[in-house]
Amino acid sequence: LDMTKNQITKELNRQAVLFEQKCKQGQCVDENIRFTDLSEMWFTDYAENNLKKTTLVSYKKMLKVVLPAIGHISIGKLQPHNLNTFYNMLLEQKIGCNVTCHSDEDFKNYINVHNGKKYDKPRMSQNELAEKSSVSIATINKLLKGNVISVECAKKICETLGLEYKKVFKETDRSTISPSTVKRYHALISSICSFAVLQNIIPINPCTRVKPPKVNKHEADYLDEEETTKLLNTLQTEPQPFRTAIQLLLFTGIRRGEMCGLSWEDIDFDHNVIRIKRNVLYTQETGVYEDTPKTATSVRAIKISSHVIGLINDYREWQEEQQNKCSNQWRESKRVFTNALGVPLHPSSVSKWFARFNQKNGLRHIPLHSLRHTSASILVMNGVPLNAVSKRLGHACAATTSNIYSHVFRMADEMAAEALDDVIFKKTSENHSA
């Protein structure tokens, strides 16, 4: 059949739409599938069933940056230079990644805050706004305090409140993208391409021919002996439950989420053992949720001293007193760490309390996770074998522990060399003197 130029163009467009629909339905998948469509397949068929929720949330955000850059490219034509160009654009801040915004508008005019003031207009409650906009309460609180929030959240809030985004918000400068962040983008793209290889869509993962930027290794930050002693002494006058929570993190090296996930049944008072079975995490998208520990080896039993058991017993007495005081208001959760009403501790509240505690007492500011590093460094410096330290921390392998604390192991090795010198030369000099 002879077709006019317009008819040919129309038919080609129709076939393209049909092909795209088949690709999305999994009926026709080959190397011509666009990276965008492949990423949707990967997310549904692999990611949702195999990745942790925190990783999924992070990857969703990252895909919003990846897809505008390379989503239009068919997977069979995705070349190393496409990826290198994308990574360089990230490093040079030429891509809208990590863009935030702030507003000089007083959002208390639109959001209900119990501050005693009267307002002319009816206002929406924070919970209602969070539900309608799909923005977390934490983000709304940041907005009310005048802090920056993501552009995406700001636009959702404006749409819900009937405000014009460009009139209310001003975008801030894009924050710098570090090489380690670029490496995470590389890992995401590589995972999608590996999925394509496994599905026989392409023969080779193009990411294997690309070297992401070199990441400078940062030493784990931890407290020295003097700082640790000062921290413990200062904690003694602090209130429960934080006093015991901080000490437990230091003495066991467990992660924040593992501590928040502890139930009373996880503590064996007869054998001085804590069993790590779950992890409590928080994301803005999902709120607080319970998950399995980080890795399979993170499910573990940790031996603790009689001193630590004593701390936990004292804390349990405090919790029982609070339960008796609150009576019907007490919220039974069976969790170890709760507030005075029995509500399980929010992971972020522990970190925020620790930051305020350090500032109030003139202690060096360190993130809460550094207590884990401090615990590990104390073990290493006191000659505890690498495998024992690794098992206690719940690392997947001893090499992970060795890499994270390589500088601590070097220091311990130097101390061992000096100790050896002291013993040998002392005996040698004594023999010569004799």
What are the language-model segments listed below?
Residues 1-85, 89, 95-109, 113, ...:
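N-terminal DNA-binding module of tyrosine recombinases/phage integrases
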Residues 62-65, 73-76, 100-114, 118-208, ...:
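N-terminal DNA-binding recognition helix of tyrosine site-specific recombinases/integrases
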Residues 96, 271, 284, 288-299, ...:
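C-terminal secondary-structure termini that scaffold catalytic or DNA-interacting sites
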Residues 100-103, 154-162, 166-168, 230-234, ...:
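DNA/chromatin major-groove-contacting recognition/catalytic segments
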Residues 103-117, 121, 155, 172-179, ...:
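Basic, Lys/Arg- and aromatic-enriched nucleic-acid-binding interface segment
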Residues 121-126, 131-135, 175, 233-242, ...:
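Short, basic (Lys/Arg/His-rich) helix/loop patches that form interaction surfaces
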Residues 131-135, 145-146, 162-163, 261-267, ...:
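A short, basic/aromatic helix-end/turn motif that makes direct DNA contacts
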Residues 146-148, 214, 218, 280-282, ...:
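Catalytic-site neighborhood detector that most strongly recognizes the C-terminal catalytic loop/helix
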